[in-house]
Curated annotation (Swiss-Prot):
This is Neuronal regeneration-related protein. Phosphorylated on Ser-59. Phosphorylation decreases stability and activity. It holds the Pfam family Alveol-reg_P311. Residues 21-54 are annotated as: Disordered. InterPro entries: Neuronal_3.1 (IPR024417). GO terms for cellular component: cytoplasm. May have roles in neural function and cellular differentiation. Ectopic expression promotes axonal regeneration, induces differentiation of fibroblast into myofibroblast, induces myofibroblast ameboid migration, augments motility of gliomas, and increases retinoic-acid regulation of lipid-droplet biogenesis. Down-regulates the expression of TGFB1 and TGFB2 but not of TGFB3. May play a role in the regulation of alveolar generation. GO terms for biological process: axon regeneration; regulation of neuron differentiation; regulation of transforming growth factor beta receptor signaling pathway. Residues 44-54 have a biased composition (Polar residues). Interacts with the latency-associated peptides (LAP) of TGFB1 and TGFB2; the interaction results in a decrease in TGFB autoinduction. Interacts with FLNA. The keyword Phosphoprotein applies. It comes from Macaca fascicularis.
Amino acid sequence: MVYYPERFVWVSQEPFPNKNMEGRLPKGRLPVPKEVNRKKNDETNAASLTPLGSSELRSPRISYLHFF
């Protein structure tokens, strides 16, 4: 299995679907590497910082982050 951090894609060498799956996705959650969790937390923390010289106390709203 290969992980591409810049694309957020998991690639597996196993054929899909296999006999156990019978055309369905496997039960349970897919593995999420720690790098993705750490990056997501870092982006969230950075997004909540206010710009220097700003008196604004609320966090800015981010509309370009899409989670799926």
